[in-house]
Amino acid sequence: MVELDHVVEEVLKVINDNGFSQKGAFNLRQNGTSICHGDSEHIKIKKKTDKPGIDIYIDGDTKGEKVYIPVVVSVSGMTDLVYNDFYIADGADVTIVAGCGIHNSGCNESRHDGVHTFHVGKNANVCYQEKHYGEGNGTGGRVLNPVTNIYVGENSVFNLDTAQIKGVDSTVRETLVEMDKNSRLYVTERLMTEGDQTAESNIEVRLNGEDSSAQIISRSVGKGNSVQTFHPKAVGNNKCQAHIQCDSIIMDHAEIGSIPEIRARDLNAAIIHEAAIGRINDEQLLKLRTLGLTEEEAESVIIENFLN
Amino acid sequence: MEDNGAKKCLLDHISFQVDDGEMLVITGPNGGGKSTLAKVLIGIEKAESGKIFLNGEDITDYDINHRANAGIGYAFQQPPRFKGMTVQRLLALAAGREMSDQECCKLLSDVGLCAEEYLNRQIDGTLSGGEMKRIEIATVLAKEHTLCIFDEPEAGIDLWSFSMLIHKFEEIHKEKKQSLIVISHQEKIISMADRIMVIDDGKIKAEGLKEDVLPCLNGLDKCHTCAGKAGVRA
């Protein structure tokens, strides 16, 4: 077992809710290098030979197993680019816990660009959890630009749960999902920005297969002078259903934009988009204050639950 | 008080007392000032003059959360919705501590909800007005208070749940000996009161023991018999 330094351990505690341990299938990447990895009976991880990154093979007998692939960047001035490809066999049932934390105590920009591609077979059930986080008292920026490509096979279910809660100065998130017959997609995106942080999220879902369905829920909170832009897009290429819901709480001098796009190329495509941006509701604050919470506590509870 | 930016006298010379374990029902026409009075008591609205005491302590300058922590529970007439917050989380916040599934289920059952179905439900637009109202009442029941204020608890609740609610008020009133102020138009609730206060046009029109005020409620202006006993201020 590889001994981890204090910074890495603390970052892992934040980005992996249930804790990271060097057991089962896992791969921990720190500052551009895989520092430890393990396979399980049904999940094998192989290092790429042509570019940085790993290939993760999840066989069809995988049932309810978790694989951890966290990334930590703790050197100021580093740009880490990684390509991770997931091959999920027919019938597999797996949870993939990713996440990236940047600890920057220096004056140079630290950046992680993760390109993740999922090849999901038929009748599979995949849950992908990704938490992004930044910390450190340096003046250098903390930048995360994830690219996620997902190909969901027939009758498969894909849950994409992403959260960027704190400390990331700039992010541009690109997500593309291609859906086959009768597949289902659930996307939950949670984002909070503060200070002068900027965040942009572009999600495109192509519902190609008959009876495919997608639900995209995006919740965000913008504080300080931060700027957020959302561009969710659902394209119905067949008989399908899609529902996009974007809710944002705006605070201080923040700026939030939501630019939806829904496009149908089939008479039986049903696609809905809802978007709302607004300040914290006064009635909510009052209710929580009548329970004994201060205004600050009430505000924090509202944000925490809204993003939960 | 300020009402839509203009100075208006919404409550005038309101003075009353609720004794330990007493149930006071405030009734009267819509727009008469009942809910405003309740909001003044919890601190949501501020009165320009006057004093409010709780157990002898002057709480006039306390803000909302201090009044809540001092022992006032308050149920909104139209409770707000919270996207992302579960029913169980709200009840825990109301109780001021973590609550087990069993404790939450008991509270929800007390207000007529099939408990287990609701614990992880979000308090959002998927809940009906009646469900919201019952959860709101459960938030007040989650903690022991010196004084509980309910603003039209019957509104939006079906008859079956209403009977359970009445039973719960009786329990708070008679067994727990908590003081209660209930704003209501509902005959069954009014008849549970120890004392009744009628507010109209921002003023107390009548106040007294239930048996003295109740007979006058249907014709307050014409009532002469109870004037002496109930202190009718026509």
Q: Which role fits each region the language model picked out?
A:
Chain A
Residues 1, 287, 296-297:
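Sequence-level preference for short, compositionally simple segments enriched
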Residues 26-28, 35-286, 290-293, 303-308:
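Conserved beta-strand/loop scaffold segments within soluble protein domains that form the structured core
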